[in-house]
Amino acid sequence: MTTKGYIGSYTKKEGKGIYLFELNEDSGQISSVNTGYEIEASTYLAQTDDYLYAITKEGEHCGVAAFKKEASGSLTLINKCLESVEGTGCYISVSSDHNFLFEAVYGAGIARIYQLNKDTGEIIKLIQELNHDYPLGSHERQEHSHVHYINETPDCKYVVATDLGTDRVVTYEFSNEGLKEYKVSKFKDQDGPRHIAFHNNGEYAYIVHELSNYVSVAKYKDGQFEELERHLTVPEDFNDDTKLAAVRLSHDQQTLYISNRGHDSIAVFTITENGAGLNPVEIVKSGDQFPRDFNITESDDYLVCAHQEGNYEITVFKRDTNTGKLTPTDNQQIAPEGVHVSFI
C-alpha cells in the first residue's frame, strides 16, 4: 500500500518549496521525495479534495497560492493572492464549506481571511487583516501579538486563533464581511499558546504552549476554552532551550502526539475519559533537529516527521495501534527545511 503526501518547507537555505513523497506502508519506507512545486516560503499547506493552498511570498508581498491537485499528487498553479505587505503567514486552513481560507501571521500578529471560489479553487480576494490588541505576556518573546494558528471550530460556528504573545485563544464569528471577536480565553503568563487539536467529539481541545512547553487539556463550549489539566512535554530535568511545536491526534482518538524543537523529540500521551484527560506514555527522539511538524497516516500505522534543521531527515515511525508507542524505521530520505507534513 502506497500513501502519498506533501511536505512544505522554508526556502531560506536549501528548501525548494512543496515536496511530494510516497510512503510504502508495507515496508515503512519513503520510496521517493520529489519537488512537487518550487515556490517561496511554503511553510504551511491546507487541502480540500481537489485543491491545495500554500503560504507564499514574492519580495515584500505576502499571501497564499492555490493549486489543482492531480491523482498523481502533481500540482498545477491556479492563482496567487499576494495583497499584503504585513508579513508571511505561518498557518492556514480552509473553512468546512470551502468558501474561506484563514491565515495566521506570527510576525505581524494578525489574522487574515480570504474569499475562495469553492468550485474552481481560485483565491478571489483578501477580505480582511485583523490585528490583536490584548495585554502582553511577560516573556521576552511576548513583545507584541503573535498569531500562530487559526482554524474553524468543530461545530463550524466559529474560527479560533492562538496568540503566543498575549497568552490568549480568541474565537471569532466569520462571514463575507470578515472576522468579528466573539470570546477570549486566557492562559497562564508565559505559556505562549501555539496550536490546537480538537477531539472528534468536539467537547475537548488540546492546546500546546510553545514557551512553557506544556499542553493544556481544555473543555470547549460555545467559543470558550476552560483548562482541565496540563502536562509537560519534555523531561522535567531538561534545562536547555526547547520550543514545543506541532500537535496531532491519532485517527482512532486514542493517542496525542506533540513535537519538541530543541529537545528534538515527540511526546506521546494516551487520551482518557473520552477526551477529558491525558496520561504520559513516552518521549522519543525525533531522529534529527527541529521537528516542526509531523502527521499520521490514515491507517494509523505510521507517523511521518519532517525536520527544519540538521540533515533535514524525514523520519518514519511505526505506531503500536494499541499503546500509541513509536518505533523508528530505517529511512534515508530528506526534505530540506521541511516544516509541514500532510497526506493526500
Curated annotation (Swiss-Prot):
Gene3D superfamilies given in the database record: YVTN repeat-like/Quinoprotein amine dehydrogenase
Gene Ontology cellular component list: cytosol
Source taxon at top rank: Bacteria
InterPro entries, A to Z: Cycloisomerase_2 (IPR050282), Haem_d1_sf (IPR011048), Lactonase_7-beta_prop (IPR019405), WD40/YVTN_repeat-like_dom_sf (IPR015943)
GO molecular function per UniProt: 6-phosphogluconolactonase activity
Cross-referenced SUPFAM superfamilies: C-terminal (heme d1) domain of cytochrome cd1-nitrite reductase
Any Pfam family the entry gives: Lactonase
Family statement drawn from the similarity comment of this UniProt entry: Belongs to the cycloisomerase 2 family.
UniProt name for this protein: Uncharacterized protein SH1032
Native source species: Staphylococcus haemolyticus (strain JCSC1435)
